[in-house]
């Protein structure tokens, strides 16, 4: 669909990215937070550093319209997986988000023989694209005991809610579930 709009995708690894492309990627990243009233916590310096030190593990999927950069998906590559993390665009185009964030990631994994593609957190819309909910964990330590207890209490409640949400989302799976 994006080809019909004369949009082309250009995949650039961190070590190949020019200063201009790094600045563009950071700008697209920040624009998403600006639109959603969030705070883009990753600086341009961070982007420069990961491109310098992580090289081929940083994968930018730039979208171009008439040689103008209009969007970018920012992914990170592990030994056998590609992890979608950030996205941003100048203007909305039909199917552009899914092309850059999902279809290009899938194609990249096939080309590079990566076994796993994690398109990123959140998004019930990912079910229709074939991505089922996956439970993840994280570990954190809070020095303040009262704050720690409040977070623990919240996490206990959240765990049940997340279990129920995953169950509901799995019922929407486009795949036939074996019994």
What is the predicted role of each segment?
Residues 47-49, 68, 103-105, 117, ...:
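Residue-level detector of functional hotspots within protein domains
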Residues 1-94, 141, 156, 173-179:
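A conserved beta-strand-loop-helix scaffold within acyl/acetyltransferase catalytic domains
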Residues 1-11, 116, 121-179:
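Terminal substrate-recognition subdomain of acyl/acetyltransferases
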Residues 79-145:
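Acyl-donor binding region in acyl/amide transferases
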